[in-house]
Amino acid sequence: MKNSFLENLNQGVHGLKPYEPGLPLEHTQKKLGLDKMIKLASNENPLGPSPKALDLLQGKMNTFSSEFNRYPDGNAYELKEAISKKYNVNLNQITIGNGSNDLIEFVSRCFLGEGKKAIYSQHGFAIYPLAIKATGALPVKSKAKNWGHDLELMSDLIDDKTKVIFIASPNNPTGTAKTLSEIKDFLKNLPDDILVFLDQAYYEYIEGSEFDIPFSLIDDYPNLVISRSFSKAHGLAALRLGFCISNPELSDYLNRVRQPFNANSLALDLGKVALFDQEHISKSVKINSSGMHKVKKAFSNLNYNFIESWGNFISFDAKQDSDLAFQYFLEKGVILRSLKVYEMPQHLRVSIGTEEEMDFFLRVLEDYEKDLSKK
């Protein structure tokens, strides 16, 4: 029997392919029957959550459990106060998301629809075209330059139907980043009726002051939205929490399409503590920098081309079909990310893990290179 009601699906939903997350660690290890397996596929913080956030969780466990029947603070007031204090922004500039993906959805729902366009970059985050298409709008893919955003080309692609431009710095999965000067030049020459969503989920890992893009830039460019995430350096990926800063009028509209209780109580309470745990953030960045240096050195020694990264991951040319390479590492106990879906048919992405995890990955990489050279 034909489900005729499916004929009424919104046009943009037809043909959508769902986002595919990294393989789950325990299930995959059990399925393959391996004694040891590590996951370096989802750009998670190998140190885990902020210790101060965990201390709060332990101390308030009884309180939390007795309040599970209560809705969370729908306005996230205390978390917004913490963000306001740390970044010197006004409360009415802040929008809280269930992860930063939520914020991408807010912007798409507010500004996109049938007959409209949004521009994103080749090799850019897979959620951008999904969010655009779901509204019925047309995603316009701008060809990448040196694995990153070609801002000049993105400007050239603008027409009277363009409403939003998505930019990530650092960009996932390539790790490329844009300097403040490059972003300023781009905004300066952009029509002020086009919204720019600057995704900075990996902001804390950036090394180099030239890449520091302050929230105060919004004062000069009210069509700019800057998003951040608690999933990476803060180690709260499981709680799904992010935020964006925009001009107050825009923030008002973003909050109108936001679900009333989109961030749960645990996320709100732990987020405001993790935000100020600078010791944990610094340690996370230090471990990432050390692991990045080690893996880049190994890639160079084994003659693997890699893309310079400003995130907590690095992508490299596996010298063969990325799905085949992914399967090899998987069977050896390392979950990586194949980048074929990102139009990078020979590239794998590896998240920077603990020293022990990176040593394990590099041993498998050496075995991979030996086996590859036999073919």
Give, region by region, the residue ranges found by the protein language model.
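N-terminal small-domain helix-loop-helix segment of the aminotransferase-like
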Residues: 2-99, 106
